From Swiss-Prot:
Its EC number is 2.3.1.234. Keywords: Acyltransferase, Cytoplasm, Iron, Metal-binding, Transferase, tRNA processing. Substrate binds at L137, A138, S139, G140, G141, D170, G183, N281. One of its GO terms (cellular component) is cytoplasm. The lineage of its organism: Bacteria, Pseudomonadati, Pseudomonadota, Alphaproteobacteria, Hyphomicrobiales. Belongs to the KAE1 / TsaD family. Required for the formation of a threonylcarbamoyl group on adenosine at position 37 (t(6)A37) in tRNAs that read codons beginning with adenine. Is involved in the transfer of the threonylcarbamoyl moiety of threonylcarbamoyl-AMP (TC-AMP) to the N6 group of A37, together with TsaE and TsaB. TsaD likely plays a direct catalytic role in this reaction. It is found in: Cytoplasm. Its cofactor is Fe(2+). It catalyses: L-threonylcarbamoyladenylate + adenosine(37) in tRNA = N(6)-L-threonylcarbamoyladenosine(37) in tRNA + AMP + H(+). This is tRNA N6-adenosine threonylcarbamoyltransferase. Gene3D superfamilies: 3.30.420.40.
Amino acid sequence: MKILGIETTCDETAAAVVTVGEEERGRILSNEVLSQIAEHAAYGGVVPEIAARAHVEVLDRLIARALQRAGTTLPEIDGIAVAAGPGLIGGVLIGLVTAKTLALVARKPLLAVNHLEAHALTPRLTDGLAFPYLLLLASGGHTQLVAVKGVGDYVRLGTTIDDAIGEAFDKVAKLLGLGYPGGPEVERQAQNGNPERFALPRPMLGRRQADFSLSGLKTALRIEAERLEPLASQDVADLCASFQAAVVDVVVDRVRVALRAFAGVAGHPTALVAAGGVAANGAIRRALAAQAGEVGLSFVAPPLPLCGDNGAMIAWAGLERLRLGLVDDLTVPARARWPFAEAAPAA
């Protein structure tokens, strides 16, 4: 079984072909990604109109390249998976219309994938992970702790009440005059900084629910930065290190709460998983691995190229759905918002 995956929900244009190898393990035959960082850098963030136009310009060629590098052709593909949301609606529409056209012309099943679900299922592609597992899904637009019980069966244990983790990193980078994208720049600066110089708050620590709040942390950093202006290079590094250390502490505390809640909705987890762009952050990965070890769990995070948006995760989610007979018709809509996990019942 071979699935073509198409991803256009934000500022990466991606296409990939995924299959199932020995012992039903996933295998990536090709994974083509074109980033739009250069197009958006001058604006300090993603401009939806620019993103949509960039998708239009390259998507057809990228799909052709993905098929070629996979050593296959469209008639040999068993299904066409596409991220139908959530995301910037212009980009989502471009990917979805392209996938619908290919499915119609080639007479292949259309598999409309939730972009967040694709992140959630990535460890099954990379590590063959069994259900259920606890997922920290953290990106520029989303931060959630989810009990992943099965394909299409997700229980949200916690979410952010304001900024997503990746969004907070990006805003801090912009405030400090760092480059775009902000997350990697903050992490790079933090490597040369003192994480104990600034006593930044750890919002929500000790709360019974597994929710996040990062706006107060971001405000506290801004106050410190304004107090020190003009900022020396060491000031910037120390601010980044202190901010990152605070985020790590918050993440670990929230994960502890979610682990306690997990048993009530899904039994015993097979692993602690991090996915999404923020899962590429080394400090967060190390802290989560240590936390998992403390409670006797393995820690799983995708290889760095699969943390960000990519076509392989879309293709894999489509493959998982196709194996269950979950096929979509050509009227499936594009969605700017598309929650993928139900909230856990109130305690």
